[in-house]
Amino acid sequence: MKSNILYLKYGLSIAAALIAYFLIIRVLGMHDNHWLRILNGVIVAYGIYAVIKKKKDQEKEAFEYFSGFWLGILTGAVATVTFVAFMAVYLFHIEPAFAERLLKHIAGSIGGPEILLLILTIEGISSSVILSLTFMQKFKVSRNITKKHAHA
């Protein structure tokens, strides 16, 4: 499967999982609990890990560090943009009062719902970069000489 298909498939899957999780905690009346956002990170981390692993499994020895790293970032970007678009609709049209409650807790009285969308975008992109770098440490092909071969 080509990388552009992978990042779209996994990015949209991550976004769907984030949206489903948000709607579930919304139905349960727990969407005001900010600590439940931690699971968002777990969902994104799993998706980025899975897409990089899939690419490495496909390419085997031809797998390159930069292509895996970039794939993780693109996957996270697709997930972020999709989720932020959903949240924009939710905050502006479905439950504007939720945005007001979040603003009081997070940003004080600065800005409107747009600041929340900016925060979500920055969080999503930055966590995608950090997670991609982290997972590539596991998946990168080592070019180091092993101790066994160094003494031969």
Which residues does each PLM region occupy?
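Membrane-helix interface/capping segments
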Residues: 52-68, 92
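Alpha-helical transmembrane segments of integral membrane proteins
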Residues: 5, 9-13, 36-40, 66-75, ...
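Short, membrane-exposed interhelical loops at transmembrane-helix boundaries
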Residues: 97-115
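Hydrophobic alpha-helical membrane-insertion segments
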Residues: 72-89
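Transmembrane alpha-helical insertion/packing segments
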Residues: 1-58
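Hydrophobic alpha-helical transmembrane segments
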Residues: 111-133
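Membrane-helix interface motif
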Residues: 89-99
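Cytoplasmic juxtamembrane regions at transmembrane-helix boundaries
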Residues: 138-152
